[in-house]
Amino acid sequence: VTGQTYTNIFPTANFNFTPARSKNLRISYNGRTNQPNVSQLQNVPDATDTLNIRIGNPSLKQEFNHNFNIGFNTFNVLTFKFIAANINLSTTKNKIVSSITTRGPVQTTTYENVNGYFRAFSFVTLGLPFKNPKMKGSSINVTNNMSYVKDVSLVNTKQNITKNISLSQGAGVNINKEKIDFGVKANIAYNNVKYSIN
């Protein structure tokens, strides 16, 4: 019989600041746990597929995820200019990952706790209205997105660290007149992935 006792903790914190009706800053934090499931804990080999054997790890700890978020937006009611920005950071302690070992044609999978997972994401959107009074309600919008993920896996008991960087830039034009509602947008993206084990 495999058994574990876990204590769940869910801390949260929030801060909201509105210096003006059209400006807002939000900061938040939350933490959460994630328990391993029964199959991840059970120390009994599952050889249903003799070439892919699975066995649990009764010593697994539960994961704990930290998540931070910062958001800001401002809107000018006279010019319709707006800015929206957000940053999100998260990291996981004792992340549960598959540990894969290959011996000949047989692959054995078990589970381990690792540290080092980190994720960062941000976006900024800028709305620039046309100054021409005849184009009131129309605007040029520019958006930038960035993300970075560092993940950890185990291959033949060795840590494989994956780093993924993604960037994207978008721009669009929205035309909004009495009889015309038209929009066009273009986007360019870049993605780079690196592994510590090739």
Where are these regions (language model features)?
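Exposed, low-structure sequence patches enriched in small/polar residues
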Residues: V1-N198
